[in-house]
UniProtKB/Swiss-Prot annotation:
Protein name per its UniProtKB record: Serine/threonine-protein kinase Sgk1
Annotated ranges, domain AGC-kinase C-terminal: 356-431
Family listed: Belongs to the protein kinase superfamily. AGC Ser/Thr protein kinase family.
Extent of Polar residues compositional bias: 81-91
A single BP term in Gene Ontology: apoptotic process
Database matches in Pfam families: Pkinase (PF00069), Pkinase_C (PF00433)
Main location: cytoplasm
Function field: Serine/threonine-protein kinase which is involved in the regulation of a wide variety of ion channels, membrane transporters, cellular enzymes, transcription factors, neuronal excitability, cell growth, proliferation, survival, migration and apoptosis. Plays an important role in cellular stress response.
Compartments it resides in: Cytoplasm; Nucleus; Endoplasmic reticulum membrane; Cell membrane
Residue positions, PTM Phosphoserine: S74, S78, S397, S401, S422
Length: 431
């Protein structure tokens, strides 16, 4: 017996129909194991995927926008384009491995949650991002860049470490070091400004982290108090690498307009090519804020603030030392070619007289006692997180794979876009 269908759909024989029925019966038996595994089996059967009945049952549909419609059927997907809705090949990396306890941060594409690994009894900060939101804003390159940068940061004491990353059909998960001493921004808000020794200590650890990134040809581009955390002992931890630019060598430049308004360097505002020295401008802006309570050139009117950054001379009040004044003048030099760090990068910062009291070997080995201790009692101590976050309920969807998700064209696009996102550490690392 042969059933004739449209020519474009091919010929459906009795044996092939039996094969499809067997797949559907298997689906019913495996329902409790989750839809994702079944979908993966279907997706690997290119003939079954093209059949209209299978498409109808699984809701695998083409985009409905008129400009995307194509009368000709698409060719079978290549192996690299197959729908991959499994969370990860790493057995440690799936949502159900965690107890998600509290929301501790929010961003443009998702939330950061305090989570405890069920088997390891270890606390992590898990950054959960919505694929749909990332694709809508066309930020997928920045997300993958953030993952790549995180993989390189594992061994630096002042950069947040990535333990593993994985994905479900609709979400990306970064499993990161849990840092609960609070954002530098939070502490600045409470105390308004810091005494110079404390500001020096933080600036030195920040500079060390930036210098390490530069040694990897990475420009950070978004240094600000919100991205600087304190760990439980009071050391700096730099986080959020979404705006990092890779492959920027010493004499290389880039031109993407990005950053946070208060901390943008003049060359970025001018939309001119810029280099690593944008990070030293930002360090100057953060140091200024630590000493004075507001960023340099600040105005509530953004246009006026931009004009100040471009044209207004730097004004320094007399309540800082000459070495601090000299450092700020060097870092906040409007001409990037004359800026401190333009010639020898981190070595210029490191050798500045303002840091003469810093033993850099002791600093990198955390042998210098921080000037402030957050005094957290343990992982569950959330006193340094904004209650706006911690009082928000944890979404139920965070901790499980979405068994009932429909495999639409957008899900297919997301699966293809983020192929290779999942990461598991070597067996002798972390887990």
């Amino acid at each position: 017996m042969t059933v004739k269908t449209e020519a474009a759909k091919g010929t459906l024989t009795y044996s092939r129909m039996r094969g499809m029925v067997a797949i559907l019966i298997a689906f019913m038996k495996q329902r409790r194991m989750g839809l994702n595994d079944f979908i993966q089996k279907i997706a690997n059967n290119s003939y079954a995927c093209k059949h209209p009945e299978v498409q109808s049952i699984l809701k695998i549909s083409q985009p409905q926008e008129p400009e995307l419609m194509n009368a000709n059927p698409s060719p079978p997907p290549s192996p690299s384009q197959q729908i991959n809705l499994g969370p990860s090949s790493n057995p440690h990396a799936k949502p159900s491995d965690f107890h998600f306890l509290k929301v501790i941060g929010k961003g443009s594409f998702g939330k950061v949650l305090l989570a405890r690994h069920k088997a390891e009894e270890v606390f992590y900060a898990v950054k959960v991002l919505q694929k749909k939101a990332i694709l809508k804003k066309k930020e997928e390159k920045h997300i993958m860049s953030e993952r790549n940068v995180l993989l390189k940061n594992v061994k630096h004491p002042f950069l947040v470490g990535l333990h593993f990353s994985f994905q479900t059909a609709d979400k990306l998960y970064f499993v990161l070091d849990y840092i609960n001493g609070g954002e530098l921004f939070y502490h600045l808000q409470r105390e308004r400004c810091f005494l110079e020794p404390r500001a020096r200590f933080y600036a030195a650890e920040i500079a060390s982290a930036l210098g390490y990134l530069h040694s990897l040809n990475i420009v950070y581009r978004d240094l600000k108090p919100e991205n600087i955390l304190l760990d439980s002992q009071g050391h700096i931890v730099l986080t959020d690498f979404g705006l990092c630019k890779e492959n920027i060598e010493h004499n290389s430049t880039t031109s993407t307009f990005c950053g946070t308004p208060e901390y943008l360097a003049p060359e970025v505002l001018h939309k001119q090519p810029y280099d690593r020295t944008v990070d030293w401008w930002c360090l100057g802006a953060v140091l200024y804020e630590m000493l004075y309570g507001l960023p340099p050139f600040y105005s509530r009117n953004t246009a006026e603030m931009y004009d100040n950054i471009l044209n207004k001379p730097l004004q320094l009040k007399p309540n800082i030392t000459n070495s601090a004044r000299h450092l700020l003048e060097g870092l906040l030099q409007k001409d990037r070619m004359k800026r401190l760090g333009a010639k020898d990068d981190f070595m210029e910062i490191k050798s500045h007289v303002f840091f003469s009291l810093i033993n850099w070997d002791d600093l990198i080995n955390k042998k210098i006692t921080p000037p402030f201790n957050p005094n957290v009692s343990g992982p569950n101590d959330l006193r340094h997180f904004d209650p706006e976050f911690t009082e928000e309920p944890v979404p139920n969807s965070i901790g499980k794979s979405p068994d009932s998700i429909l495999v639409t064209a957008s899900v297919k696009e997301a699966a293809e876009t983020f192929l290779g996102f999942s990461y598991a550490p070597p067996t002798d690392s972390f887990l």
